Swiss-Prot record:
GO molecular function: guanyl-nucleotide exchange factor activity; zinc ion binding
Source species: Drosophila melanogaster (Fruit fly)
Residues engaged in binding Zn(2+): C22, C25, C92, C95
Disulfide pairings: none
Subunit structure: Interacts with Rab8.
Keyword flag Cell membrane: yes
Keyword set, alphabetical order: Cell membrane, Guanine-nucleotide releasing factor, Membrane, Metal-binding, Protein transport, Transport, Zinc
Domain MSS4: 9-120
Name of this chain's protein: Guanine nucleotide exchange factor MSS4 homolog
More info: The name stratum (strat) refers to the geological term for a layer of rock as mutants accumulate basal membrane proteins as a continuous apical sheet/layer. The name also highlights the similarity of the mislocalization phenotype to Crag mutant cells, as both names are based upon geological descriptions of rock formations.
Length: 122
């Protein structure tokens, strides 16, 4: 179970109030007002996997707060993983840390997890 976080300060008129950046290298991923707030619980692999996991299983956590980006070209800088169970996972294109969200292949929409990024303009 994930701890509840309050992201209300990051949302203005249903959009991201400030730029969205990688929490590790500060790379700009998404400019302000480009993502739409979306709540939907989805299991996303942990950023750090446990050593004792089997090769075909990923340790994951349920996340529910996302920035919805309908066109992948909207991103300033994002990377995509190989396809896993009908999804591609989003990573920082500069430092390759992640996943910071996922890309749904059926809708072609991207979901950037608020919990996995930082929100700041500089």
């Amino acid at each position: 179970m994930t701890e509840e976080a309050d992201f209300s300060e990051q949302i203005t008129d249903g959009k991201n109030k400030s730029n969205v950046r990688c929490q590790f290298c500060n790379c700009l991923m998404l400019k302000a007002q480009e993502g739409t707030y979306n709540q939907e619980e989805v299991d996303v692999p942990l950023m750090t996997q446990k050593q004792d996991r089997t090769a075909d299983s990923l340790n994951s956590e349920p996340l529910k707060d996302f920035w919805l980006v309908k066109d992948m070209m909207t991103f300033e800088n994002i990377g995509f993983s190989n396809t896993v169970d009908g999804r591609k996972f989003l990573v920082c294109a500069d430092c390759e840390r992640g996943p910071v969200g996922y890309h749904d292949l059926s809708t072609r929409h991207c979901y950037l997890a608020l919990k996995r990024v930082v929100h700041k303009d500089t």
